[in-house]
């Protein structure tokens, strides 16, 4: 089998590349996905409110676990990643958050990455998006990804939580992806007008999969990339339960889009990475790149939970006897409780003046429950998900064997810096202050978690060690740049090799301020133009907010 391009991973970025490259009918593409199809009849992935379900099984989730995390009481922590057409966009929380403009400007400070500034990237965010209220300088109107805005009156707790943030002295913003990210406001989500999850399988692949020049193989577990000298010339993979490899050759390029956990594993199994690690497993060295699998970053978050005195939370939706009606409303009308992820309000703040742009993110949820659907509080309640955005802690992903089915050693080194502890203590104390504003007085009951007895630095630290969880935002393991630990250049091309790029969240040099999916899609759009040799979209001239030393919050 011969193709112009072979794409490994039909996830958030891989599906973008498959769709854009096959717009040229003379370009042939093979898209390999280790998971299965995105079954449209399966409510677990298609109903926004069911977002916890895919994380509980292994049909759509790789369900990785970390090594014991040394600063988290040696807990082995979840590291869920999407498996199937759509990748993690098939199982994520559907929060459409791009990050802060200064994240990208910060990337562009690196020599060679100058064209990754916010204004260079904004046209690609817009290209990918169709926002339900129409386009403007910041948002697109005819892209493959459906973005739904929060509407007034959905739940009084959303408005009350935003108002409480403002009463605590923080800014109000009407668009967390617009002129000003900093502040509290409504959150956009990747949901279609029909109330379905807007994964990249739905948005991108639906328009491309009927093209004769696109071949899609599911249940195809990539074993390794084939090299001729320093040039990537093909891919070998295992189909289904077969132990006999299948191979295809790429006339132009192999495009690795397997995500921040799998992309470094595939490079390592293919002989690209740290020479000592590869020697341990008798893998012939193709090219030494010590940064492969290093620089692993993530967002940690905690839940601060409160009893709700008014019967306005989503608690009744958790009762089995209410679920048939909710399911029918969603299935036949695309409306009701099932049609939202219920992350419809949130915010970004600076916890201290020393941060030039927000370092703490909030998601508000009008029910008290863990993100993966466990430990639901058996009463009306609400909660804040809160966590730091740009932790200095760094970890790694390393293969444990040559077997592609064996999970790697994953270590995030969560909370390994004093800055982490300071940010989380600040986050808990600031959140309590916000939760005690007048806007929430009629709703706020007792604090369920951490509980009012948890007050000292030592008590707060112990709560974080035992209860902080991943936000499922791993990135950085094949970082873009030109220093000795970088893996790819500013166009995603792997250093020292030919015909091989990495295009996914692993190439982010530093994690962004917010959820990763929108930016991963943007990376796919931007590099698709580079691969095709097309001129980049014209730089945006939109303005954006920079705090420039402004006070963190207004004086009362």
UniProtKB/Swiss-Prot annotation:
Cofactor(s) for this UniProt protein: FAD
Reaction equations catalysed: choline + A = betaine aldehyde + AH2; betaine aldehyde + NAD(+) + H2O = glycine betaine + NADH + 2 H(+)
Presence of keyword Glycosyltransferase: no
Binding site for FAD: 4-33
Annotated GO biological process: glycine betaine biosynthetic process from choline
Keywords from the named record: FAD, Flavoprotein, NAD, Oxidoreductase
Any one Gene Ontology molecular-function term assigned to this protein's record: choline dehydrogenase activity
Active site positions, chain numbering: 473
One Pfam family in the UniProt entry: GMC_oxred_C
EC number, as in UniProt: 1.1.99.1, 1.2.1.8
Top EC class of this enzyme: oxidoreductase
SUPFAM superfamilies, A to Z: FAD-linked reductases, C-terminal domain, FAD/NAD(P)-binding domain
Pathway where it operates: Amine and polyamine biosynthesis; betaine biosynthesis via choline pathway; betaine aldehyde from choline (cytochrome c reductase route): step 1/1
An example Gene Ontology CC term for this record: membrane
Protein family (similarity comment): Belongs to the GMC oxidoreductase family.
Function text: Involved in the biosynthesis of the osmoprotectant glycine betaine. Catalyzes the oxidation of choline to betaine aldehyde and betaine aldehyde to glycine betaine at the same rate.
Protein name: Oxygen-dependent choline dehydrogenase
Organism: Shigella flexneri serotype 5b (strain 8401)
Classification lineage: Bacteria, Pseudomonadati, Pseudomonadota, Gammaproteobacteria, Enterobacterales
């Amino acid at each position: 089998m011969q193709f112009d391009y072979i794409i490994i991973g039909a996830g958030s970025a891989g599906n973008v590349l498959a769709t854009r490259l096959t717009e040229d009918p003379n370009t042939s593409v093979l898209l390999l996905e280790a998971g299965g199809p995105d079954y449209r009849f399966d409510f677990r992935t298609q109903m926004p409110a069911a977002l916890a379900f895919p994380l509980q099984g292994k049909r759509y989730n790789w369900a990785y676990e970390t090594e014991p995390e040394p600063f988290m009481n040696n807990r082995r922590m979840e590291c869920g990643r999407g498996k199937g057409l759509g990748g993690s966009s098939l199982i994520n929380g559907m929060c459409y958050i791009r990050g802060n403009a200064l994240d990208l400007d910060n990337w562009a400070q690196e020599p060679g990455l100058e064209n990754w500034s916010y204004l260079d990237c904004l046209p690609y965010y817009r290209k990918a998006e169709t926002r339900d209220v129409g386009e403007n300088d910041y948002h697109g109107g005819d892209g493959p990804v459906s973005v739904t805005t929060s509407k007034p009156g959905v739940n009084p707790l959303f408005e009350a939580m935003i108002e409480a943030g403002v009463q605590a002295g923080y800014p109000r913003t009407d668009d967390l992806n617009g002129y000003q990210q900093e502040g509290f406001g409504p959150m956009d989500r990747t949901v279609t007008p029909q109330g379905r999850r807007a994964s990249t399988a739905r948005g991108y692949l639906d328009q491309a999969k009927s093209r004769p020049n696109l071949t899609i193989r599911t249940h195809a577990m990539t074993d390794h990339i084939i090299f001729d000298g320093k040039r990537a010339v093909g891919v070998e993979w295992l189909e289904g339960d077969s132990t006999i490899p299948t191979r295809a050759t790429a006339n132009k390029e192999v495009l690795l889009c397997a995500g921040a956990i799998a992309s470094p594993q595939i490079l390592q199994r293919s002989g690209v990475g740290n020479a000592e690690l590869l020697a341990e497993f008798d893998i012939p060295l193709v090219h030494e790149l010590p940064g492969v699998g290093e620089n692993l970053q993530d967002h940690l978050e905690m839940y601060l939970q409160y009893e709700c005195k008014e019967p306005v939370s989503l608690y009744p939706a958790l009762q089995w006897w209410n679920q048939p009606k909710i399911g029918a409303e969603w299935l036949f009308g695309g409306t009701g409780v099932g049609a939202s992820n219920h992350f419809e309000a949130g915010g970004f703040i600076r916890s201290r003046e020393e941060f030039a742009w927000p370092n703490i993110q909030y998601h508000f949820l009008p029910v008290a429950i863990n993100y993966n659907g466990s430990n639901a509080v058996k009463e009306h309640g609400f909660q804040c998900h809160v966590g730091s955005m740009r932790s200095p802690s760094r970890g790694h992903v390393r293969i444990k064997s040559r077997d592609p089915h064996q999970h790697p050693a994953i270590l995030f080194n969560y909370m390994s810096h004093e800055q982490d502890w300071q940010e989380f203590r600040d986050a808990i104390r600031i959140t309590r202050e916000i939760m005690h504003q007048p806007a929430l007085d009629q709703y706020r009951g007792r604090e369920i978690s951490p509980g009012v007895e948890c007050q000292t630095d030592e008590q707060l630290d112990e709560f974080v060690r035992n209860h902080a969880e991943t936000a499922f935002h791993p990135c950085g393991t094949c970082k873009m740049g030109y220093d000795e630990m970088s893996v790819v250049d500013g166009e995603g091309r792997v250093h020292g090799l030919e015909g091989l790029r990495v295009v996914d969240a692993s190439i982010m040099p530093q994690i962004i301020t917010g959820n990763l999916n929108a930016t991963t899609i943007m990376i796919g759009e931007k590099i698709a133009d580079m691969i095709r040799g097309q001129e980049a979209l014209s730089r945006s001239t939109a303005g954006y907010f920079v705090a420039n030393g402004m006070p963190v919050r207004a004086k009362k």
